[in-house]
């Protein structure tokens, strides 16, 4: 990678500089390599998260104990009709057709624990802010990140690292949850964020942004801190059109909030809708000369949920078994096609940021606790 090459050459140059001529050639070489790092690489990354979607629904589809349970489903027969199939592979296909029809043929899907593929959190909190910090930095920080309070993240995310290394306009974050301004530390990082119920401030606004701002104020959300994912998705697409970012992060939130509400029907509908939103982003990338054949998609979740007792599916946290169980999907440039990983392996959420650093030629963090890139060969 170019960053590693720069570091090596810098060290060599320091040992070689004994006169002005050597200094001149080393400085010229370093400047050329730095220019190539920021101008030549055509790698793009779309990082996407689905808040609190269990691995069980992703890999097995609708839960037999919940799909007709009137405590959690208002219209059991309607849900059963579209979501239920006898075989798990058919159920998951009904729930997330893009993932199981198309992504499985062009990437790698980790986290089916029934097949021995495991993904876990390395943080000990097992809820959202610590989970997103781990995903976006590559390291758990239980000492500083132990609540969902709106506290500026003391840690540098890969978004901030990208903004400082390259062009800050070429990176952005869009999220349904209003805490992300603090998770990304928008004020310090300078990364453009549009989170919660924020209107677009990406001046000058175009017609789409003006309309989205109006609609967001006119259409109520079921929650006070999380907007509907359709707004997050459309704000992100407008930014893609206006700025063609090389690194974009989109965080969808409906799955977690419907689960907390105990509404299994809406939880499944949100998962199915998000599958379609991801398909829309992939289609967008394939129709763009800027993104086609140059883009890696990485999709994951910030935490799992409970299974036993049955009511624990609504919640998560270190007191609920299974809340540390996650999953990872990767496809696109640089990802070999292995489909659903069926061999025994153990990944952690702290490996996502290092993998993105590798894709985007960003320096790796070498301190203890940081994950290592995922082996995609």
Placement of each model-derived feature along the sequence:
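Histidine-centered active-site microenvironments of extracellular/periplasmic hydrolases
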Residues: 69, 300-331
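Catalytic-site neighborhoods of secreted/periplasmic enzymes
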Residues: 124-215
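Short, solvent-exposed loop/turn and secondary-structure capping segments
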Residues: 56-62, 114-115, 146-148, 174, ...
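Metal-dependent active-site segment of extracytoplasmic phospho-/sulfohydrolases and closely related
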Residues: 46-47, 55, 274-314, 356
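Short, structured active-site-proximal loop/turn typified by the sulfatase FGly-forming signature C/S-X-P-X-R
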Residues: 56, 60-125
């Amino acid at each position: 990678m170019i960053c590693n090459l720069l570091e090596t050459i810098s060290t060599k140059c320091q040992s070689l500089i004994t006169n002005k001529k050597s200094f001149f050639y080393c400085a010229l070489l370093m400047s050329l390599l730095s220019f190539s790092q920021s101008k030549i690489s055509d790698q793009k990354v779309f990082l996407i998260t689905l808040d609190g979607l269990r691995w069980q629904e992703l890999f097995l589809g609708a839960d037999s104990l919940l799909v007709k349970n009137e405590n959690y489903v208002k219209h059991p027969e309607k849900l059963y009709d579209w979501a239920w199939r006898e075989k798990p592979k058919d159920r998951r296909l009904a729930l997330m057709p893009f993932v199981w029809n198309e992504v499985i043929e062009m990437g790698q899907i980790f986290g089916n624990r029934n097949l021995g593929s495991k993904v876990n959190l390395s943080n000990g909190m097992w809820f959202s802010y610590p989970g997103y910090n781990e995903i976006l930095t590559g390291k758990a920080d239980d000492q500083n990140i132990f609540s969902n309070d709106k506290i500026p993240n003391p840690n540098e995310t890969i978004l901030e690292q990208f903004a400082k290394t390259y062009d800050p306009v070429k990176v952005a974050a869009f999220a349904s949850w209003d805490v992300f301004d603090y998770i990304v530390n928008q004020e310090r990082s300078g990364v453009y964020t549009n989170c919660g119920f924020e209107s677009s401030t990406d001046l000058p606004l175009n017609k789409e942004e003006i309309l989205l701002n109006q609609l967001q104020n006119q259409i109520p959300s079921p929650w006070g801190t999380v907007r509907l994912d359709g707004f997050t998705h459309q704000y992100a697409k407008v930014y893609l059109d206006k700025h063609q970012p090389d690194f974009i992060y989109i965080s969808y939130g409906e799955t977690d909030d419907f689960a907390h509400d105990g509404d299994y029907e809406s939880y499944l509908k949100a998962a199915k809708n998000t599958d379609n939103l991801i398909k829309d982003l992939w289609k967008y990338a394939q129709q763009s000369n800027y993104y086609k054949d140059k883009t890696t998609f990485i999709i994951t979740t910030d935490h799992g949920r409970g299974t036993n007792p049955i009511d624990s599916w609504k919640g998560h946290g270190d007191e609920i078994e299974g809340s540390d169980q996650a999953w990872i999907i990767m496809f696109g440039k640089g990802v070999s096609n292995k489909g659903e990983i069926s061999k025994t392996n153990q990944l952690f959420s702290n490996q996502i940021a290092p993998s993105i650093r590798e894709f985007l030629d960003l320096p790796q963090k070498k301190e203890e606790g940081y994950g290592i890139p995922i082996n995609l060969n």
